[in-house]
UniProtKB/Swiss-Prot annotation:
Assembly: Interacts with UBE2A and UBE2B.
Zinc finger (UBR-type): 118-189
PANTHER family in the record: E3 UBIQUITIN-PROTEIN LIGASE UBR3, UBIQUITIN LIGASE E3 ALPHA-RELATED
Pfam families per the UniProt record, alphabetical: PRT6_C, UBR1-like_wing, zf-UBR
Reactions this protein catalyses: S-ubiquitinyl-[E2 ubiquitin-conjugating enzyme]-L-cysteine + [acceptor protein]-L-lysine = [E2 ubiquitin-conjugating enzyme]-L-cysteine + N(6)-ubiquitinyl-[acceptor protein]-L-lysine
Gene: Ubr3
Compartments reported by the entry: Membrane
Topology of this chain in the membrane: Multi-pass membrane protein
Membrane-spanning segments: 761-781, 919-939, 1807-1827
Tissues expressing this chain: Expressed in numerous cells of the smell, touch, vision, hearing and taste senses. Expressed in cells of the olfactory pathway, including the olfactory cell layer of the main olfactory epithelium (MOE), a mitral neuron cell layer of the olfactory bulb (OB), and a pyramidal cell layer of the piriform cortex of the olfactory cortex (OC). Expressed in the vomeronasal sensory epithelium of the vomeronasal organ (VNO) and the mitral cells of the accessory olfactory bulb. Expressed in tactile tissues, including the dorsal root ganglion, trigeminal ganglion and follicle-sinus complexes.
Name of the protein in question: E3 ubiquitin-protein ligase UBR3
Amino acid sequence: MAAAAAAAAVGDPQPPQPEAPAQGLALDKAATAAHLKAALSRPDNRAGAEELQALLERVLNAERPLAGAAGGEEAAGGGGGGPGEAEEDALEWCKCLLAGGGGYEEFCAAVRAYDPAALCGLVWTANFVAYRCRTCGISPCMSLCAECFHQGDHTGHDFNMFRSQAGGACDCGDSNVMRESGFCRRHQIKSSSNIPCVPKDLLMMSEFVLPRFIFCLIQYLREGYNEPAADAPSEKDLNKVLQLLEPQISFLEDLTKMGGAMRSVLTQVLTNQQNYKDLTAGLGENACAKKSHEKYLIALKSSGLTYPEDKLVYGVQEPAAGTSTLAAQGFAGATGTLGQIDSSDEEDQDGSQGLGKRKRVKLSSGTKDQSIMDVLKHKSFLEELLFWTIKYEFPQKMVTFLLNMLPDQEYKVAFTKTFVQHYAFIMKTLKKSHESDTMSNRIVHISVQLFSNEELARQVTEECQLLDIMVTVLLYMMESCLIKSELQDEENSLHVVVNCGEALLKNNTYWPLVSDFINILSHQSVAQRFLEDHGLLVTWMNFVSFFQGMNLNKRELNEHVEFESQTYYAAFAAELEACAQPMWGLLSHCKVRETQEYTRNVVRYCLEALQDWFDAINFVDEPAPNQVTFHLPLHRYYAMFLSKAVKCQELDLDSLLPDQEMLMKLMIHPLQIQASLAEIHSNMWVRNGLQIKGQAMTYVQSHFCNSMIDPDIYLLQVCASRLDPDYFISSVFERFKVVDLLTMASQHHNMVLDVEHERSMLEGALTFLVILLSLRLHLGMSDDDILRAEMVAQLCMNDRTHSSLLDLIPENPNPKSGIIPGSYSFESVLSAVADFRAPIFEPGGSMQQGMYTPKAEVWDQEFDPVMVILRTVYRRDVQSAMDRYTAFLKQSGKFPGNPWPPYKKRTSLHPSYKGLMRLLHCKTLHIVLFTLLYKILMDHQNLSEHVLCMVLYLIELGLENSADDDSEEEVSMGGPERCHDSWFPGSNLVSNMRHFINYVRVRVPETAPELKRDPLASTSSDALDSLQNSGTAQVFSLVAERRKKFQEIINRSNSEANQVVRPKIPSKWSAPGSSPQLTTAILEIKESILSLLIKLHHKLSGKQNSYYPPWLDDIEVLIQPEIPKYNHGDGITAVERILLKAAVQSRMNKRIIEEICRKVTPPVPPKKITAAEKKTLDKEERRQKARERQQKLLAEFASRQKSFMETAMDVDSPENDIPMEITTAEPQVSEAVYDCVICGQSGPSSEDRPTGLVVLLQASSVLGQCRDNAEPKKLPIAEEEQIYPWDTCAAVHDVRLSLLQRYFKDSSCLLAVSIGWEGGVYVQTCGHTLHIDCHKSYMESLRNDQVLQGFSVDKGEFTCPLCRQFANSVLPCYPGSNVENNLWQRPCNKSTQDLIKEVEELQGRPGAFPSETNLSKEMESVMKDIKNTTQKKYRDYSKTPGSPDNEFLFMYSVARTNLELELIHRGGSLCSGGPSTAGKRSCLNQLFHVLALHMRLYTIDSEYNPWKKLTQLVEDMNSQVGNEDQQPEVPILYHDVTSLLLIQILMMPQPLRKEHFTCIVKVLFTLLYTQALAALSVKGTEEDRSAWKHAGALRKDTCDAEKCYEVLLSFVISELSKGKLYYEEGAQECAMVSPIAWSPESMERYIQDFCLPFLRVSSLLQHHLFGEDLPSCQEEEEFSVLASCLGLLPTFYQTDHPFISASCLDWPVAAFDIITQWCFEITSFTERHAEQGKALLIQESRWKLPHLLQLPENYNTIFQYYHRKTCSVCTKVPKDPAVCLVCGTFVCLKGLCCKQQSYCECVLHSQNCGAGTGIFLLINASVIIIIRGHRFCLWGSVYLDAHGEEDRDLRRGKPLYICEERYRVLEQQWVSHTFDHINKRWGPHYNGL
């Protein structure tokens, strides 16, 4: 048999064998295996080995299994049972052989016993739930499986749960990655010492079999691989091969799970080079093997980085003089050795594009190994297996197998080296892959396990040149998508940048490689090698330069751009991930003095790269106009390393800075970005589309800002501190295009800016200067100060949740940097600056999360508008911060008006940056400040309060940071000889402030008003002399000077400048001929900055001479200038503060201020209105008029809404609602008047034009969820916990009805109970009324309006036109009747007997069939709506479908449902009294009319009318019982009395008279009381009954026997004893239930409790029908108060009487006779069915309030049980598990497995459990979803973290705890049916949930 099997395996053409019994075959295999094992155990085992090889050769022949995959389908479909069977057979053989003839399971167990189990190593794939503990982690990538996490002790640790993105492995037990204290119990013990050695013979067979098995697998992989054709991707073919191989790979995976012993055998097999050589060499004779080997060689071909097909596009340039030779030899991307690609070039088979032949030389002195360039050579199975894993694009099974082996240390090292060896090949495969996302995840899944271990990373860095390989591979990867840069000089640029539109960047294909690079740089030892290696640094800077200037934006000036490119996403992601994150990784290792050398290296090569870049883009001195790139990674590297050098390494800044010319160049592009930001916000780039705004926002956004805008501003601060301040300031205003605006003239012409942009650009320029001079992030602030400033800025904009703060505070963006969010300093700073506001509810139901809000002292002392401006993504946030600041000042009484941004003192500058303050003390800035102050004072156009604010801010900054050479007293008033060249004598602001400027020469258009009033028309020599001496200057003659200076510097230092001849781009571009003629005018000014400030004070305050120097009254202010009153205020305060500071700093200033104040201030010149301004004013006037018209209209509408608003439409809190008055309240008016909210008319409802109430009809099962226990049930959180719904109100009523239907006539049963406990129809209204015809046209307009949110007009849904509450029907108001009319009905003196007759007579009158009117149509229509609201199963309980009795039952049950629900809304009792608050704005009166109208169409045959049985004695009782062949009617004592009440009332003609109502209640109370006595008698024991019978019999003859409970109880017992009711009780029943000790008090309590539900419903009904108020009372007196209210208790009766219930009785006929009659029906029934008879008598009357399930405190408890729970239908774990919070059912959200008739499970369950309302907790998201009919909404979460925040989708994975308050609100919305009104975001679910 073995021979036959073997022969079949070889594939000889054999006749089909008759199938042998499997068992025999197994025995045979076992015998062969045992024989071979014995043979191999001998000392000379050569023969055994050969025999085994021959067997394996046959069994594992590689020819057949993949024939189906590789060679078409025939083989697979062909005979012999297909390849599957043969493979299974081969695997069976392998298992038998490994076990050596024993059982395979036993073998596995034996091997497991030798597992040292030091590491967990459990491998998981994407979406697996794992944990990360930062307290225990050494590497930030550390993760634990759930089991190890819960087995370890992490209490109080900073941990979180996360859903794995790419897969991972458990690190428990690995002390390289985590601290031992965090190991779980299983991996804590280093148990290897206790494990005995593995017996040699146990794994001997494995050592023989596995090499052959793995070789066979490799042959399959070779055989199955076909190079993908150029046109079609081959994924399908690859997947087919992999599917066929799945059993083999699973087999290997199972072997790895056997533990350490088996893993070490596998390691030997996989890494043994001899084995590999022997097996792969001996292939000569086998043709098939040859073919597979050839395929392998073809596949290997493209594995190196050398491209033989590279086309030479540009020759390699010789290295330019002065550039680093290394850079030139290496990949000199920045110096332009890479040409543009010819787009017609086909990609070679490798998918890389030819990019010029480059000299390939050694990358660094350390690179001895050239193997990265060459084709791979494999020396072991492991190497080839990894090769195929890559080739097949990382199949999940293979990845898992390779990772499962990692706990074996020897394997881990070998595998890591192999992975590094294949790194370039991985990159090439990844680039070509069509599934790069999946592949990326799988690569990282592997690499993160290898590179997170520092020791291992260091080892492969040393032994395998890991760093060289990574950098080279990254460089090569990016080279395939380079294009010529168009920045600056488009034609002559030699710079190449990445093309952000390429898939490589767009799809983030590079991220796995960058992620690995960042990971290894997080290890100090590896990073140090990188920073020491000059060659690597050069290469890396070349790599970074590929991103320098990418995604260039060119401003559209004519028409809107046609296609808005979205490439900026790719650009920002690339800079952050590929440039910034590695930079942060390197920076984290440059923290101490000892690492100075590293910083010097980076700075040096960075500057070289920058110099190369400037050369390559051909940059001279001016940036090209209308161009901006946000990407300057080289600048940012340079800036960040400079900052680190000064801050942490005590390096001298000047030693790292280049010459002045380079500094001037360095500042240009970052400054261009700042100017462009202002342009973008001024809408100057509007034609470029929204994406340019997106770029401006991303640049400052929290995840990017500290890698982008912060380094840019820091670099500008460094340049400003070292360059000439006048040059810098003039450059800023030039860049911002506002130079022309800075003139004293009232008119000017700006050649580079439209007038409408001037103001915002000027604001931008000044704001930028303020930020530049105020910001200290890199200039001396400590990390904690920075954190505090960032936090305060964010909190000032808005209150924030903890998680949003964590997200908004810019942190080191390198995830491996070890800076942990939520670390100690974050929490301590947060508690210092903010107060926590617990989660709250706002009226209307919107839920707030836990928020942090700034403390009062933070607003007072730390609010920093500059930081806020820097960090706002949206401009509105700045306004929000100011509004909040204003509110604080008003609340705290510090300032009542509209404050200006406060001036905040800055932390001191680091000495290296002192030069920055020279900007504040340069003449150019002082000229600008002077000019702007003057222009503001003279009301020139385009100047705003914001400009003034910034001007004053800059002056104050200058005074705070006074210049060092402060010998200002000696510099007298400044003689004329000092100021020929400029306006001011010196550069010190303190002295320049008092310098008077008399005349200024300006260039103005000829039309300017200045020319008309030239003060110096006479040309006398005196005048000219004085002009000469007054220091007149044209503003910004300095600009030209600085330009000259810059040009000189450049010419001096740039030896090659003569080679580069290019026209200088004019800085002011303008259309020819567009500029008007300018002429020179001379203005008389005669002001100083001080005088302008004082006049400004007058202008701002609106009073002449308003400024009075405070030191004249109180000299103290000069000594103690920090006066709190100046801290907060408006412009006036700011001016006062500045003048005081100026006076404090200089006696001269103080004197001049006093002098100016003494002079009478001349009035400000009147404002002339120009034509343009007049136009603006007209516009304003028109706007104002339009506004007034709008106000009028709004006021009119508001008056309509007033009544609605007054009732405080707070649907959330029923207890404080005021009812909406539906009708007018004057009792003398006979007819109710209604307002129509659509047409606004008032009037009564009529037959022809009925008015209706806006109502929402909904099916409800809330009543059915009531239980007899007040404690809510708990959500099951273990298998053994189950919820059974036997004790719910719905279940009990269901059982009762089916019991009645089994024994009694169906039509009678349907009148004996109520339905609607499940699926009852609840009607609620907002209280607004409308004409029904108006409503129809309103619906029509909604139908035509396509923009509908969340409701379906076709289903009749709409929102109330006034209050927007959701509704779906209109309930007609019956004409005439007014509730209050019934109040003044005359008291009735008729006897009870007369009233009983009247009731009977009125019920007997047939209801008049309504005439065909609009009203009757509407009544019919609304009845149809009510029926359609609930499902058929909830309204059809009759045995004969469609029976009228059923209709009848449904209608009165609707009334019952609404009354019972109102009771529940009132808390289950009527103790609180009051109007119908909890019933919302009740519509019961109107509902009653509709129901009564329809019920009167049916008549109950007077024979069957229960009223007869209640009020008359029957002559022949036997006729009632019914005979044998027909079922009897339901005995009256089994009837539900409340149902009887509703039947009786609805059968009466409406409106009902109060006396008839009271009569019906009195009659029914007698029946109810008798039922109570009967139920009590059944509850008592035999002894109780005999005692009660005896006691009552004694008093039977007293006068009040009919009102004595003892007598009546005694009589009921004696009557019921005639049947078998009491005989059934066995002794065992008594033993089970502990008997109650009955006392007279407890019996009275029982009777009252039995009757109370009826009294409550009757009282509510009386309240609604007759408008009587409900009395409020204590709980214990509820019975007596309600009885009095209903007229059951005589008014003179003492309510504190202990036995009061019987006193309410008013028997219509002799009590004992009628009781006898009622009891006879029962005894007849119990003759046959005693047990059922007794069950029907005991009715559960006291239902407690309904509750949702009780949830556990900690969400993890729910999550751990349910997220792994399997679906009962498909037994798989659902993707989106959910649990119903009403009944605890586990459901699959959106699960197709549980779909029935196109309804998914949640929708179906919501219909079955809640009649259309479902409340589900989504396990994987922690949120609650509400289903209401055909709509659904996300409600929010009832589980919050320690900071009061939701964690939707468990993204943060922090522990969550129940928020009781939220859960109560959810429950209350469920009970009060207000989901539709409170939750606003509804959408259709299309039955797909």
